[in-house]
């Protein structure tokens, strides 16, 4: 069986991995690490929980340690939470070598980040929007080092290459060395047309050919065999009661659960409702201050909260290994979003369940999802007793009504408007 030393990683890094009890490389690591060390650009496709971060961090850290000075690599990722997670992994792996990692994400002090960038950190882990903001508004003494980096990584590349990030990504890439003078690594759980277009681009004379590797074909990547997919037919007006019954039924009363919703207001209503019903719950959505988002994740990871109500900021790449159940309370419009949500459970060979609440208006979305994953969902039989639903309905309805009143008193809607204005102001600064 191969080990990390045989892949070509530096001895100090192999020792760091061993200290973290990471001794045997996964498929994506075995194939990508040696090729990246040869200087090749790389596209890596593998399901979440398969070790993609070490597949790119390993060779980057190994080569950096040969000449540990200045800005060496930039990792761009679509969400703050994923950026924080990657920064933690770089810091842990490089701790014995006095590595300097700078986290550049929204929700944190721009001034503090600029001061850190000025000190020329070795690795910058960033969301495209915040790094673009620094490039456009900070002086050369802050961002000048970016023009000499050796690596650019796009993690969750399928999302970063969408129109949502296009302008910010262009700003970031324009500041980096040209592609002939840096290595570019793309990692994703979903190989989209945009990613394949890069894979099929003409080779560059001055560089070795691009290396592309998918652990399995895309449909297997999308849905692990250990993931059990079910649907529950639910009338729209009693969704909260069904959710409460499912969370407290015999099968799931002690389980670690992520409940996905499409809107921040729904996340807040459910969090407050379940909390008043004495469910240990936390939430994660874009209207929360960054400190609260981090606190929610820490509580969920530590099992202080067993239920996390989340919008899709949590669906991407987050490593929460113990999640046993994902509930799609609202069905997403994009089937790939469903895949990423469901990928929060059944990670790294573990089993897991994903249950989707289906109202009459969701049927076409479910059909599109089933076509995308080439698999039919089974009907969930765990909550079917109408009498039990009715019994819970009064209690849940009362809790929801009180939650809505509390949100009104707390001016939740006004806070959302203020946050939206703030986000728009930041975008206009980068326009």
From Swiss-Prot:
<feature type="domain" description="Helicase C-terminal">
    <location>
        <begin position="242"/>
        <end position="389"/>
    </location>
</feature>
<feature type="compositionally biased region" description="Basic and acidic residues">
    <location>
        <begin position="406"/>
        <end position="416"/>
    </location>
</feature>
<feature type="short sequence motif" description="Q motif">
    <location>
        <begin position="2"/>
        <end position="30"/>
    </location>
</feature>
<feature type="domain" description="Helicase ATP-binding">
    <location>
        <begin position="33"/>
        <end position="209"/>
    </location>
</feature>
<dbReference type="InterPro" id="IPR014001">
    <property type="entry name" value="Helicase_ATP-bd"/>
</dbReference>
<dbReference type="InterPro" id="IPR014014">
    <property type="entry name" value="RNA_helicase_DEAD_Q_motif"/>
</dbReference>
<dbReference type="GO" id="GO:0000447">
    <property type="term" value="P:endonucleolytic cleavage in ITS1 to separate SSU-rRNA from 5.8S rRNA and LSU-rRNA from tricistronic rRNA transcript (SSU-rRNA, 5.8S rRNA, LSU-rRNA)"/>
</dbReference>
<keyword id="KW-0539">Nucleus</keyword>
<keyword id="KW-0067">ATP-binding</keyword>
<dbReference type="InterPro" id="IPR001650">
    <property type="entry name" value="Helicase_C-like"/>
</dbReference>
<dbReference type="GO" id="GO:0000480">
    <property type="term" value="P:endonucleolytic cleavage in 5'-ETS of tricistronic rRNA transcript (SSU-rRNA, 5.8S rRNA, LSU-rRNA)"/>
</dbReference>
<dbReference type="GO" id="GO:0003723">
    <property type="term" value="F:RNA binding"/>
</dbReference>
<dbReference type="GO" id="GO:0005524">
    <property type="term" value="F:ATP binding"/>
</dbReference>
<comment type="similarity">
    <text>Belongs to the DEAD box helicase family. DDX49/DBP8 subfamily.</text>
</comment>
<dbReference type="InterPro" id="IPR050079">
    <property type="entry name" value="DEAD_box_RNA_helicase"/>
</dbReference>
<dbReference type="InterPro" id="IPR027417">
    <property type="entry name" value="P-loop_NTPase"/>
</dbReference>
<dbReference type="GO" id="GO:0000472">
    <property type="term" value="P:endonucleolytic cleavage to generate mature 5'-end of SSU-rRNA from (SSU-rRNA, 5.8S rRNA, LSU-rRNA)"/>
</dbReference>
<dbReference type="InterPro" id="IPR011545">
    <property type="entry name" value="DEAD/DEAH_box_helicase_dom"/>
</dbReference>
<keyword id="KW-0547">Nucleotide-binding</keyword>
<keyword id="KW-0694">RNA-binding</keyword>
<dbReference type="Pfam" id="PF00270">
    <property type="entry name" value="DEAD"/>
</dbReference>
<keyword id="KW-0347">Helicase</keyword>
<protein>
    <recommendedName>
        <fullName>ATP-dependent RNA helicase DBP8</fullName>
        <ecNumber>3.6.4.13</ecNumber>
    </recommendedName>
</protein>
<dbReference type="GO" id="GO:0032040">
    <property type="term" value="C:small-subunit processome"/>
</dbReference>
<feature type="short sequence motif" description="DEAD box">
    <location>
        <begin position="155"/>
        <end position="158"/>
    </location>
</feature>
<dbReference type="GO" id="GO:0016887">
    <property type="term" value="F:ATP hydrolysis activity"/>
</dbReference>
<keyword id="KW-0690">Ribosome biogenesis</keyword>
<dbReference type="GO" id="GO:0005730">
    <property type="term" value="C:nucleolus"/>
</dbReference>
<dbReference type="GO" id="GO:0005829">
    <property type="term" value="C:cytosol"/>
</dbReference>
<feature type="binding site">
    <location>
        <begin position="46"/>
        <end position="53"/>
    </location>
    <ligand>
        <name>ATP</name>
    </ligand>
</feature>
<feature type="region of interest" description="Disordered">
    <location>
        <begin position="406"/>
        <end position="431"/>
    </location>
</feature>
<dbReference type="GO" id="GO:0003724">
    <property type="term" value="F:RNA helicase activity"/>
</dbReference>
<keyword id="KW-0378">Hydrolase</keyword>
<keyword id="KW-0698">rRNA processing</keyword>
<dbReference type="Pfam" id="PF00271">
    <property type="entry name" value="Helicase_C"/>
</dbReference>
<comment type="function">
    <text>ATP-binding RNA helicase involved in 40S ribosomal subunit biogenesis and is required for the normal formation of 18S rRNAs through pre-rRNA processing at A0, A1 and A2 sites. Required for vegetative growth.</text>
</comment>
């Amino acid at each position: 069986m191969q080990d990390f030393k045989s892949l070509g990683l530096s001895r100090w890094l192999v020792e760091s991995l061993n200290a973290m009890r990471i001794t045997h490389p996964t498929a994506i690591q075995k194939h990508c690490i040696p090729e990246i060390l040869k200087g090749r650009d790389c596209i890596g496709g593998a399901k979440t929980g398969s070790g993609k971060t070490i597949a790119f961090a390993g060779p980057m850290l190994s080569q950096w340690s040969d000449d540990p000075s200045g800005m060496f690599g930039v990792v761009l990722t679509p969400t703050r939470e994923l950026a924080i997670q990657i920064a933690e992994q770089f810091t842990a792996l490089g701790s014995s070598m006095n590595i300097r990692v700078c986290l550049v994400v929204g929700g944190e002090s721009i001034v503090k980040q600029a001061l850190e960038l000025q000190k020329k950190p070795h690795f910058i882990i960033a969301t495209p929007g915040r790094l673009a903001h620094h490039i456009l508004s900070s002086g050369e003494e802050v961002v000048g080092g970016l023009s000499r980096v050796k690596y650019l990584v796009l993690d969750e590349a399928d999302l970063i290459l969408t129109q949502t990030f296009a302008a910010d990504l262009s700003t970031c890439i324009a500041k980096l060395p040209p592609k002939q003078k840096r290595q570019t690594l793309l990692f994703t759980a979903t190989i989209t047309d945009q990613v394949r277009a890069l894979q099929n681009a003409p080779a560059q004379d001055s560089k070795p050919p691009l290396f592309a590797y998918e652990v399995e074909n895309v449909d297997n990547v999308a849905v692990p065999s250990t993931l059990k997919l079910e649907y529950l037919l639910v009338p729209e007006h009693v969704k909260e009661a069904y959710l409460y019954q499912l969370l407290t039924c015999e099968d799931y009363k002690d389980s670690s659960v992520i409940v996905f919703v499409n809107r921040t207001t729904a996340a807040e209503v459910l969090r407050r409702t379940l909390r008043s019903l004495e469910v240990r719950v936390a939430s994660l959505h874009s209207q929360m201050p960054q400190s609260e988002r981090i606190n929610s994740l820490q509580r969920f990871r530590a099992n202080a909260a067993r239920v996390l109500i989340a919008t899709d900021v949590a669906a991407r790449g987050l490593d929460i290994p113990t999640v046993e159940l994902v509930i799609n309370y609202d069905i997403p419009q994009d089937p790939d979003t469903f895949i990423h949500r469901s990928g929060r459970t059944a990670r790294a060979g573990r089993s897991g369940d994903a249950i989707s609440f289906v109202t009459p208006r969701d049927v076409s979305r479910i059909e599109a999802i089933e076509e995308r994953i080439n698999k039919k969902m089974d009907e969930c039989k765990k909550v079917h007793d109408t009498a039990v639903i009715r019994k819970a309905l009064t209690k849940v309805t009362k809790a929801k009504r009180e939650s809505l009143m509390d949100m009104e008193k707390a001016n939740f809607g006004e806070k959302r408007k203020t946050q939206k204005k703030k986000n728009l102001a930041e975008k206009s600064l980068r326009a």
